[in-house]
Amino acid sequence: MKLSTKNIQHIEGLRERKKAKTHVEVQKQALRLFREKGYGNTTVEQIADAAEVSPSTFFRYFSTKEDVVMYNIIDPVVIEAFKAQPVGLSPIQAIRVSIKSSYDGFTAEESADLQERTKLMLKVPELRAKMLDKLTQNLEVLTKLTAERIGRSADDLAVRTFAGAVIGVIISVFFHDDENLNANLFKHIDVALTQLEAGLPL
């Protein structure tokens, strides 16, 4: 998978850009092997060999095989986009714009890889568990960012509830689209966030 220009703009310094490219190349080879051999039948050593790195180098970039699937280079882009949104936007509006603007720059290959990784997270038991850990981390990040945006404490229950609701509707889209994750994924996420913004009317 090629890194789109939009995805590497946020990465400062040659060293960091090289690290990002290595992350993506290892992930690309891992996904290829998972398709060919199955997730459970693929070893770290096989991934490292396919990516032309040593196993020790693999572990400098990823702590576990599961982390290869979890890695998402776009996360920092969404965070920076959220921070840059005009103060006149509500937190939910800022989130919607940030997600849309970040993923609009995805290449077709990047979109396909994201869909493939999401399917793996939903279908492989150990990846589901890892996904829950990742979502918990995302909840903490979103809580902190929202609190900073509106000038309230990250311990404020209302702020944490808001962040949890956002994560929850995104999870609902993943499971709704479980059998048919496709180009409509981001559209469905935006629809779900729009419903949340409207108070989840039924």
Locations of the language-model features?
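Amphipathic C-terminal alpha-helical segment
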Residues: 132-133, 163-183, 198-202
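Short secondary-structure transition hinges
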Residues: 76, 112-140
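Hydrophobic alpha-helical bundle segments that form small-molecule/ligand-binding pockets
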Residues: 136-162
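Short amphipathic alpha-helical segment with a characteristic S/N-K-E followed by hydrophobic residues
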Residues: 64-69
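Basic, helix-initiating cap at the start of DNA-binding domains
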Residues: 1-37, 41-56
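Hydrophobic alpha-helical connector segments
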Residues: 80-116
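C-terminal peripheral helix-coil segments that are non-catalytic and often amphipathic
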Residues: 1-6, 144, 179-202
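Base-recognition residues in the alpha-helical recognition helix of bacterial helix-turn-helix
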Residues: 59-63
